[in-house]
Amino acid sequence: NYLNFKCVLIDDISTDNTYEIAKKMVSGDERFILVKNTEKKLALKNIYEGVQLANPNQEDIIITLDGDDWFSNSNVLTYLNDFYNKEDCWLTYGSYAEFPSGKKGKFAKQIPQRVVDTRSYREYEWCTSHLRTFKYHLWSKIKKEDLLDSQGEFYRMTWDLSFMFPMLEMAGNKSRYIQDILYVYNLDNPLNDHKVDNIYQVKLEQEIRNKNKYESLVDDGTRPEHLLRHNRFDIAAKLIFIKDKILKRYISETLGCLE
């Protein structure tokens, strides 16, 4: 029921009539861009090219939705728009339910503040899964090479870590956990990464975790260089002046007692 959006649909060599159904449903609606790949590109490369096709503004919100999953209800986009306006955030994660069990997914939960403060996301357990949303200005600052594996190819598995870690590190306290269920993760799909090659998945995860961290883009006033801004220096100077007056009075009174 939220109308102000643009949707890039990419058919990655599907083997059924998905493309024909999608084409019929979005025909004539300029909000949709429908792409039919002629070669298999897999998730991350499709997301990378899909964002480019969307041609977003810096403040636009990007949402990733896997083709075999779905939103939990028709109000998700409205919910997210209101949430971003209220929280003034740059990135959100969570929450999702597993299909067909209906259980809440375990890989989306609140990141501890100490992890945010130290940007130690890569050392902490993975907990920023579906639903993943972020401002384009964060995405645009990710180095392309950090989306590529040691062979120079887009990550085939654990690809969400390759872009979420950099954006979490850049966003800092501008990231938010959403407790409400917005996403349904289809565990019935036999092609889920952990079902295909779990050993390879773990290997790629470690490779991504070992990459360099990104600097925070948030001015939270806690870094040393921020303490020298004119307004903070003014406060510091006043405190020093007050302490100096107290010290002089203390010395004067002490000397008076000695006399």
Q: Where is each model-derived feature located?
A:
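Nucleotide-sugar donor-binding/catalytic module of glycosyltransferases
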Residues: 1-223, 230-231, 243, 249
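Low-complexity, charge- and small-residue-enriched intrinsically disordered regions
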Residues: 241-259
